[in-house]
């Protein structure tokens, strides 16, 4: 029992220590992105695909080497067996061996092997670029989820602040009601407002929990329990100018974005497919080489003696001697000409041309997709910056208006309905400001990312 209890205690303390460590750690955006890239299943699958393309490239190079294959046969014969010495059948059981070693070397096949090597090089590059594209997409998704947490965190704080103000107002209104300064209806309306804000706060906290869950799922973590992120201090200068125009950013991004480069590589691959298909029209020249020998247990060796009655005298023919004496080797050349093969070569060439056109359209589509993404991000960044600047003014105005309304409410000059309306307008203005702030941050980070700048909230 003691032997069983000790390992269990160790496991419990280890788990507790791990959980405590996770609770103490706060994840930055850079750490989240790195962890996601290291643990994402889609990335791991693409790594395997890249290794697969690497093997294809290596195999295409090895195909230039000559082939060499060996074969060994051992057979038994019963009753009537051909005597290889006299070429007559004898009534005798026997055994025989045959050994063969041969292969071939491709000398010319329309440069198909060389074009296959070059094609596989570009396929490997395309696979590596696809891997980088997946990493980039995951990085952007992580950044969006991270900023969503920051936004929801600010909304929770804003809602909680409004609730605390309402609770303080309940106490003031209670005293005024006890003193007979206000009617009970005023107190009930403020209490109803507090209940509404408590429900709103619960909803905001639920949204925050969901945003944490979303991020931890992207990170492939088992649970969001104990997971926290760094809350950076982010300030926005409303007078800032977004550097670069859409066309300038697009020109820069074309040479950086892996999806564009991958589409270019795939177009090149299709062009080599056409060269390979055309190579099938060429004659094929190969060199063949072989070496063989054999052994038979019933074969006899002429001793050099001739009996006057029976004729030539034969003796045992040892295995090693037969193998040596029967050794045969040589080489030759083979030339084949494709003449008529059901128009397969012509159809393959036609299909390769169609494939080239398809990949050209694919490249054009990727460029248009990138341009539209940059165009949309640029427009969204400008709009959110303007919205943020306007919301700053709105919040300042609403805060001043609310202070004035609150002062009047405290002396009974404003009804609870007007007071609650002022609070609601202030909270909405604060929420709009937070949403515009993080939308602007994300869109500018997307534009910087297209320029080759790593995702980082500290910049």
Language-model features: locations:
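Sec-dependent N-terminal signal peptides
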Residues: 4-13
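Bacterial Sec-pathway N-terminal export signals of envelope proteins
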Residues: 20-73, 79, 223, 230-268, ...
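Acidic, low-complexity, intrinsically disordered peripheral segments
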Residues: 20-22, 30, 223, 432-459
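Short flexible linkers and secondary-structure junctions
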Residues: 22-144, 285, 289, 308, ...
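Small/polar, glycine/serine/threonine/aspartate-rich low-complexity segments that form flexible
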Residues: 23-25, 71-105, 233-241, 275, ...
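Sec/SRP-type N-terminal targeting helices
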Residues: 44-48, 61, 107-135, 160, ...
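Periplasmic alpha-helical coiled-coil/stalk elements that build and connect Gram-negative outer-membrane
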Residues: 137-252, 380, 384, 404, ...
């Amino acid at each position: 029992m003691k032997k069983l209890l000790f390992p269990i205690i160790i496991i419990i303390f280890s788990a507790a220590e791990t959980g405590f460590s996770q609770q103490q750690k706060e994840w930055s955006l850079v750490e989240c992105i790195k962890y996601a890239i290291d643990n994402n299943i889609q990335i791991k699958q693409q790594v395997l695909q890249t290794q697969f393309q690497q093997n294809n490239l290596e195999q295409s190079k090895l195909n230039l080497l000559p082939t060499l294959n060996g074969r060994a046969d051992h057979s038994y014969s019963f009753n009537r067996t051909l005597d290889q010495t006299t070429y007559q059948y004898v009534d005798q059981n026997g055994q025989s061996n045959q050994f063969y070693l041969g292969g071939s070397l491709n000398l010319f096949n329309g440069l198909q092997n060389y074009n296959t090597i070059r094609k596989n090089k570009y396929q490997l590059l395309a696979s590596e670029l696809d891997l980088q594209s997946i990493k980039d997409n995951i990085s952007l998704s992580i950044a969006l989820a991270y900023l969503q947490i920051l936004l929801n965190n600010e909304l929770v704080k804003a809602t909680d602040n409004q609730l605390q103000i309402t609770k303080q107002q309940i106490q003031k209104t209670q005293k005024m009601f006890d003193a007979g300064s206000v009617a009970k209806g005023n107190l009930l309306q403020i209490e109803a407002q507090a209940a509404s804000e408590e429900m709103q706060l619960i909803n905001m906290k639920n949204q925050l929990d969901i945003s944490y869950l979303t991020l931890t799922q992207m990170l492939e973590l088992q649970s969001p329990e104990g997971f926290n992120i760094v809350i950076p201090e982010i300030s926005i200068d409303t007078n800032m100018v977004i550097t670069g125009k859409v066309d300038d950013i697009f020109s820069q991004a074309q040479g950086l974005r892996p999806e564009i480069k991958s589409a270019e590589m795939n177009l090149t691959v299709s062009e080599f497919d056409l060269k390979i298909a055309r190579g099938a029209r060429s004659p094929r020249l190969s060199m063949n080489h072989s070496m063989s020998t054999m052994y038979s247990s019933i074969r006899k060796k002429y001793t050099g003696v001739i009996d006057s009655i029976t004729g030539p005298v034969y003796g045992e023919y040892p295995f090693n001697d037969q193998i040596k004496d029967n050794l045969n080797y040589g080489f030759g050349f083979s030339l084949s000409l494709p003449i008529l093969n059901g128009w397969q070569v012509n159809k393959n060439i036609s299909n390769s041309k169609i494939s080239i056109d398809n990949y050209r359209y694919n490249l054009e589509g990727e460029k248009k997709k990138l341009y539209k993404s940059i165009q949309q991000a640029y427009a969204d960044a400008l709009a959110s910056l303007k919205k943020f600047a306007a919301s700053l003014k709105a919040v300042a105005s609403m805060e001043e208006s609310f202070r004035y309304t609150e002062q009047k409410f405290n002396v009974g000059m404003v009804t609870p309905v007007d007071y609650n309306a002022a609070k609601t307008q202030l909270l909405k203005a604060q929420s709009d400001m937070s949403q515009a702030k993080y939308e602007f941050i994300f869109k500018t980070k997307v534009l910087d990312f297209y320029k080759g700048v790593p995702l980082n909230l500290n910049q």
